[in-house]
């Protein structure tokens, strides 16, 4: 309630409102890239009898929201006059029987079609011209002796996506998966604490996600191209000098150990472990994974080192945006540290037994 009162009093920074509005607009742009999401929007508009014009003007409505609007809504709907509902888990009475409702179920007429079904079938269907992805649009640029950039123009909006794929994963660095998870809450040594870096990225309306699999380390950034240079600079500094958090590492260890305790009783996980052993033998993920002792002894210094070493491997950079691929343009690949001058990609090599 204290936080709600602060919102009602306007005790927040203006940039946070701007960041939230920009994020919502970016998410709407991404939804409009997806045929599935657009179909869901049309479906919701249809059965809620919404005006499509209002939906298409969503971004204008979001950007028109002011600080006074937020304070007004908080005071009106988030006041002390509220109803709290608490739910507790109980034990049902095994002998109790649920009574049948006191009304008869609606039985549709057999062999007849409802008025709604008739109207729906008679709705006009327009003709659509399919636009398939053209792989010929992908342009390839050599970054160094081993690393390349794959560029695809974004013809839909001004949202960019930058994916840096380093050619080394958990097979080469078994602890890299934990290091990647910590990178999602990391700062920059000597510059930003984790929360401060998140705020800086929010101001730029950019998001960054790090993950790893057996063969690669992935760094994925999305945002609007207007702030692409600044976002790439922060990303580059974070990769080169990550400041991993000890508290996050402690939580990660606890979560990993807790999940291992639970999976012993999970039939689906046991089934998957058996399947992997039948396919891969001693190379099964469940056999290769870190031991409990190794997880308990994880250190920030070694995880930071794994990120540094993995980012020195051969890389592929995938960029989708509106920036033209010309020598006169400063490209996003000039910001993230691209290794590969000395270390080639580690090819997948797990085979079935």
Residue ranges and their predicted role:
Residues 29, 53-165, 313-353:
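Proteolytic maturation boundary segments
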Residues 1-63, 84-88, 96-97, 150-185, ...:
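M16 family metallopeptidases and their MPP-like homologs
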Residues 241-250, 295-300:
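Peptidyl-prolyl cis-trans isomerase
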């Amino acid at each position: 309630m204290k936080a709600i009162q602060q919102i009602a009093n306007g005790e927040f920074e203006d940039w946070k409102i701007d960041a939230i509005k920009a994020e919502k607009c970016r998410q709407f742009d991404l939804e409009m890239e997806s045929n599935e999401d657009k179909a869901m929007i049309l479906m919701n508009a249809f059965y809620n009898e919404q005006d499509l014009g209002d939906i298409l003007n969503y971004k204008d409505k979001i950007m028109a929201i002011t600080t006074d609007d937020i304070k007004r809504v908080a005071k009106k709907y988030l006041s002390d006059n509220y109803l709290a509902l608490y739910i507790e888990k109980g034990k049902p009475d095994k002998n109790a029987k649920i009574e049948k409702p006191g009304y008869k179920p609606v039985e549709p007429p057999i062999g007849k079609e409802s008025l709604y079904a008739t109207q729906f079938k008679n709705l006009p269907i327009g003709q659509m011209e399919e636009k398939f992805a053209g792989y010929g649009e992908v342009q390839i640029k050599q970054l160094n002796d081993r690393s390349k950039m794959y560029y695809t123009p974004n013809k839909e909006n001004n949202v960019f996506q930058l994916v840096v794929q380093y050619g080394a994963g958990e097979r080469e660095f078994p602890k890299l998966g934990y290091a990647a998870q910590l990178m999602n809450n990391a700062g920059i040594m000597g510059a930003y604490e984790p929360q401060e870096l998140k705020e800086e990225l929010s101001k730029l309306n950019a998001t960054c996600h790090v993950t790893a699999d057996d063969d690669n380390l992935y760094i994925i950034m999305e945002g609007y191209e207007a702030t692409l240079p600044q976002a790439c600079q922060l990303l580059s500094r974070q990769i080169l000098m990550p400041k991993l958090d000890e508290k996050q590492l402690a939580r990660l260890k606890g979560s990993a150990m807790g999940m291992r305790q639970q999976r012993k009783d999970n039939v689906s996980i046991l089934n998957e472990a058996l399947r992997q052993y039948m396919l891969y033998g001693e190379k099964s993920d469940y056999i290769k994974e870190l031991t409990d002792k190794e997880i308990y002894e994880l250190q920030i210094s070694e995880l930071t080192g794994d990120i540094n070493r993995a980012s020195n491997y051969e890389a592929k950079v995938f960029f989708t945006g509106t920036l033209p691929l010309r020598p006169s343009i400063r490209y996003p690949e000039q910001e993230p540290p691209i290794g590969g001058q000395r270390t080639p990609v580690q090819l997948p090599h797990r085979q079935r037994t």
